[in-house]
Amino acid sequence: MKFAPLKPKFFIFFLGLFLSPFFLSAQGFESWKDLHIYYKKNNFDPSTITEEQLKYLPILSNLPPDFDELQDVKLKKKLFYLITLPIIHESNRLILEDREMGINIEKKFLRADLNENEINETVRLAVKYKLDYSTIDLRLFRDLKQRINIIPVSLALAQAIVESGWGQSRFALEGNALYGQWTTNEQK
């Protein structure tokens, strides 16, 4: 994360960059009621969730198809929180992997010990995080460290709430876009 305020367009892109690969498992939830039963059975509650429990929260492939039919606002917010929380944590975990890789490659760069794979990985990171990689130098590694950092959970959650209206927006329900991302490409 940049230490300067993120521009909204960049922030949405940044979250969208990590959001799509993490919808891994629908866990067979065909309705919000099934999801609610699962959360209740496993004692998943936003106000008391632990780091250990986070490991067992499913990462959904989409919102339950009837999520917009849920009328209880308090329950809707609770479910939305539990739906988005594992996505945010998994995204941050992968961002930290990229950051650590960049830092480790920088250490080898400082020792003038980069191999071809590390150069390719540096370029991959620069492309992924939209940085100029025409010259692999200290500036690039500084920019990588500045750009590649976790997104505070509260900020990512707030962004999902604002962009999707607690999962009620058309983009969220029809396009599975909790962060307002969209494309005109029919294949994506």
Regions found by a protein language model. Give the residues of each.
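Generic N-terminal simple sequence motifs
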Residues: 1-4, 17
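Bacterial N-terminal signal peptides that target proteins for export
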Residues: 3-11
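Bacterial N-terminal signal peptides
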Residues: 12-21
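Catalytic cores of secreted/periplasmic lytic hydrolases that degrade extracellular macromolecules
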Residues: 22-157, 162-188
